[in-house]
């Protein structure tokens, strides 16, 4: 983790992706 922004973006994308994966 170099920048907290990247961590936030990755975390948000992971959360959304996981939610979508469970939705389907």
Swiss-Prot record:
Keywords: NAD, Oxidoreductase, Tricarboxylic acid cycle
InterPro entries, sorted: NAD(P)-bd_dom_sf (IPR036291)
NAD is among the record's keywords: yes
Reaction catalysis annotation: (S)-malate + NAD(+) = oxaloacetate + NADH + H(+)
Biological function: Catalyzes the reversible oxidation of malate to oxaloacetate.
EC number annotated for this UniProt entry: 1.1.1.37
Gene Ontology molecular-function annotations: L-malate dehydrogenase (NAD+) activity
Binding site for NAD(+): 11-17
Gene3D superfamilies to which the protein is assigned, alphabetical: NAD(P)-binding Rossmann-like Domain (3.40.50.720)
Protein name: Malate dehydrogenase
The keyword NAD appears for this protein: yes
Homology family: Belongs to the LDH/MDH superfamily. MDH type 2 family.
One BP term from GO: tricarboxylic acid cycle
């Amino acid at each position: 983790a170099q920048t907290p922004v990247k961590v936030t973006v990755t975390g948000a994308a992971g959360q959304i992706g996981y939610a979508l994966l469970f939705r389907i």
